Regions:
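A polyanion-binding, active-site-adjacent surface
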Residues: 1-148
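Generic C-terminal helix-cap and adjacent flexible tail
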Residues: 144-158
């Protein structure tokens, strides 16, 4: 996911700078990129027209998203990229959306911790709404959360 596109350029550089990726970019599936202490998924898995998935796509992908989360172990922080990911993640958890506000680099006191970022879409990065420095700061903060979290070997609490 995000391999070979402009969003991926921003994302993988930030992951690399924070120690979550073995290299600062990924151009193709088998280019040697290895993630460490990280898992990348999406609420919708198809490239949506107009950069926004349709509600039907999100509904269709939700069982896969839920299953992926249920398989993860030792989750200490979830970084959501964009408001759609934020809303979808909270819905999957059964949380009231009105109890949480989305904002860049906003941290929510959940277990695991929930850290928000603007999506690294070409629209956001070309307009300066999201800069490389801003995204790097989010993943550096995620790394700090992991370092300070107590050790545990529990599945993601869904």
């Amino acid at each position: 996911m995000f391999t070979g596109d402009r969003s991926g350029e921003f994302l993988y550089r930030a992951l690399y700078e924070a120690g979550f990726a073995s290299q600062p970019g990924s151009l193709e599936r088998d280019d040697g990129l290895v993630l460490k202490d990280a898992w990348i998924t999406a609420a919708g898995h198809c490239a949506p027209p107009g950069n926004k998935p349709e509600p039907e796509e999100l509904r269709n992908c939700r069982p896969y998203f839920e299953r992926e989360l249920a398989l993860l172990r030792e989750v200490r922080v979830v970084v959501v990229l964009g408001k759609i990911a934020f809303d979808t993640y909270l819905r999957v958890r059964g949380e009231r959306l009105s109890a949480f506000a989305f904002g860049h680099n906003v941290l929510h006191d959940l277990t695991p911790a929930l850290l928000c970022s603007y999506h690294p879409s070409q629209q956001n990065t070309s307009t300066g709404k999201l800069t490389q420095t801003m995204l790097n700061e989010v993943f550096q903060r995620a790394r700090e959360i992991i370092r300070s979290a107590p050790d545990r070997a529990e599945p993601h609490p869904l």
